[in-house]
Structures are given as C-alpha cells and as structure tokens.
C-alpha cells in the first residue's frame, strides 16, 4: 500500500485512552510497594493497614460494577502515590457530596489518624 492510503485506513477498534484495570492481587501488591517507596514510615504503616482492610472487606463482592469501581479508584490512588501528587490532593465538594455517610465517617477517622501522626513527629 501507498503511505497516503495507510493514513486513510481507520483502526478496527478505538484506541484506549486509559490504561487497563489491573487485577486485584497485582494492584494490591503495587500499592504496598508504592507505599514502601514513596511514603514516610508513619504514613506507610497507616496506609498499609487501610489498604489491607479495604481489600479484605471487598474480597467477597459479586457485583461487577462495584468491582470495576473499586479497582479503578485504587488504581487512580496508585497513580497519585507514584506521581507524588498524594500530598497535594484536595477533595472537591462534588466528591464529598457523592460519598455515603459511612465513607465520610471513614474519611474523618483517616483525617484524625493522620493528624495524630503529624503531632507525634513534631
């Protein structure tokens, strides 16, 4: 084929903009490795415990939409940790409005735990 014709041919399937979702176990291990490489010791312990609890709690989920949502959010978290943007992250009002009361409670507990760690290191 001529080079000009090749440019006119469309791909059979659209290109994927986002990266594919990692399976649960490799994602879990990658998060723990990222914690080890990127987080301070105190935050790493807190983060590891939280990740272990969340993955254990979601182990028995059957709904594919919940599984995809869970893995997608944790993969986004992994990108934040690897990219170093975790320390500058802010929660928008829209994100907060989407949370259930239980999630807001978990967020508050996490905030209190990180404050205690910050006070101990001073």
From Swiss-Prot:
Coiled coil: none annotated. One of its GO terms (cellular component) is mitochondrial intermembrane space. PANTHER family: DC11 ACN9 HOMOLOG (PTHR13137), SUCCINATE DEHYDROGENASE ASSEMBLY FACTOR 3, MITOCHONDRIAL (PTHR13137:SF6). It is found in: Mitochondrion matrix. The lineage of its organism: Eukaryota, Fungi, Dikarya, Ascomycota, Saccharomycotina. GO terms for biological process: carbon utilization; gluconeogenesis; mitochondrial respiratory chain complex II assembly; regulation of gluconeogenesis; succinate metabolic process. The gene is SDH7. Plays an essential role in the assembly of succinate dehydrogenase (SDH), an enzyme complex (also referred to as respiratory complex II) that is a component of both the tricarboxylic acid (TCA) cycle and the mitochondrial electron transport chain, and which couples the oxidation of succinate to fumarate with the reduction of ubiquinone (coenzyme Q) to ubiquinol. Promotes maturation of the iron-sulfur protein subunit of the SDH catalytic dimer, protecting it from the deleterious effects of oxidants. May act together with SDHAF1. Residues 1-47 form a transit peptide. Belongs to the complex I LYR family. SDHAF3 subfamily. Keywords: Chaperone, Gluconeogenesis, Mitochondrion, Transit peptide. This is Succinate dehydrogenase assembly factor 3, mitochondrial. Interacts with the iron-sulfur protein subunit within the SDH catalytic dimer.
